[in-house]
C-alpha cells in the first residue's frame, strides 16, 4: 500500500482444498511479505460449505496477527454471495469478467448480478472501504467463447475495464495467458498483452494488476 510500491496477491492454492495445507502455504507466503493486496484462493471445490470453511480460516489468521489485508475465495460470484449470506467473513467478492454481454453470459453473470454482489459485500462484508470487488480478465477469453463479435482481443479487453470501473473495484487483474491462451502464440505475445492491458487499465483509471500465467 505504499506509494511507488507494488502490492501482490498471496495465492495458497491446494489440490484438495485441505485447510491445513492451505494454511501452510499461506503462512509461508506471509513470511515473504506477500499478500498485502489480498489473500485469495482458487478453490477446487466450488461449494458454499468449502468456500465458507476457507474464508473462516483466512479470517482467523488475519485477525490473530492483525494483518492489514483482504480475504477472498475465487469461486463463482453466486457461490461467494451465498457464503456471505450464511455468515462467511469476506472482504472482496471475485468474478472473472468479459468485454461483451455474450462473454459474460458464458461466465454466468450480468451487470445486475455484479451490482447485487457489490451491494451485498458493502452491507454484510468485512471491508472497511468502499471498494469490495475483485475482477480478473485476460486477452482472448471472448474469442474462446465466440463472444467477440469480430473485434480483436485488445478491443474486447479494453471493454472489460470499462465494465469493471462501473463497480468501483478494489483490484482488476489481467490474467494474461490463462483464459484464451490459444490466442497468444508465445512468451513475447504474453508480455505484449500484459503491457497493453496494464496501460489500458491505468488509462481507464482502475487499480490494475497483472497475473503472470502461461498455460499454452
Give each language-model segment a name:
Residues 1-9, 15:
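N-terminal amphipathic alpha-helix/helix-capping segment at the start of soluble metabolic enzymes
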Residues 3, 20-24, 49, 53:
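Residues forming well-ordered secondary-structure scaffolds
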Residues 10-12, 41, 69-75, 96-97, ...:
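A cross-domain feature marking catalytic cores of carbohydrate-active enzymes
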Residues 20-36, 60-63, 78-207:
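Alpha/beta enzyme core
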Residues 37-55, 176-185:
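Glycine-rich, proline-tolerant flexible connector loops at the mouths of alpha/beta enzymes
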Residues 57-76:
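A cross-kingdom feature marking charged/low-complexity
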Residues 214-216:
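Conserved structured catalytic cores and adjacent interaction surfaces
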Amino acid at each position: 500500500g505504499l506509494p511507488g510500491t507494488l502490492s501482490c496477491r498471496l495465492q495458497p492454492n491446494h489440490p484438495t482444498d485441505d485447510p491445513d495445507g492451505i494454511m501452510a502455504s499461506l503462512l509461508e507466503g506471509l513470511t515473504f511479505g506477500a499478500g498485502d493486496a489480498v489473500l485469495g484462493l482458487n478453490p477446487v471445490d466450488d461449494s458454499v460449505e468449502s468456500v465458507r470453511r476457507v474464508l473462516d480460516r483466512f479470517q482467523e489468521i488475519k485477525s490473530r496477527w492483525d494483518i492489514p489485508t483482504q480475504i477472498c475465495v475465487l469461486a463463482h460470484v453466486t457461490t461467494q454471495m451465498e457464503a456471505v449470506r450464511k455468515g462467511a467473513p469476506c472482504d472482496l467478492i471475485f468474478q472473472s469478467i468479459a468485454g461483451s454481454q455474450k462473454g459474460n453470459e458464458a461466465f454466468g453473470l450480468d451487470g445486475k448480478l455484479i451490482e447485487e454482489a457489490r451491494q451485498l459485500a458493502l452491507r454484510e462484508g468485512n471491508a472497511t472501504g468502499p471498494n469490495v470487488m475483485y475482477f480478473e480478465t485476460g486477452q482472448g477469453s471472448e474469442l474462446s467463447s465466440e463472444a467477440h463479435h469480430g473485434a480483436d482481443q485488445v478491443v474486447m479487453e479494453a471493454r472489460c475495464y470499462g465494465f469493471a470501473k462501473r463497480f468501483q473495484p478494489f483490484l482488476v487483474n489481467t490474467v494474461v495467458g490463462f483464459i484464451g491462451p490459444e490466442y497468444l502464440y508465445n512468451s513475447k505475445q504474453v508480455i505484449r498483452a500484459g503491457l497493453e492491458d496494464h496501460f489500458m487499465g491505468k488509462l481507464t483509471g482502475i487499480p490494475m494488476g497483472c497475473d503472470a500465467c502461461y498455460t499454452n
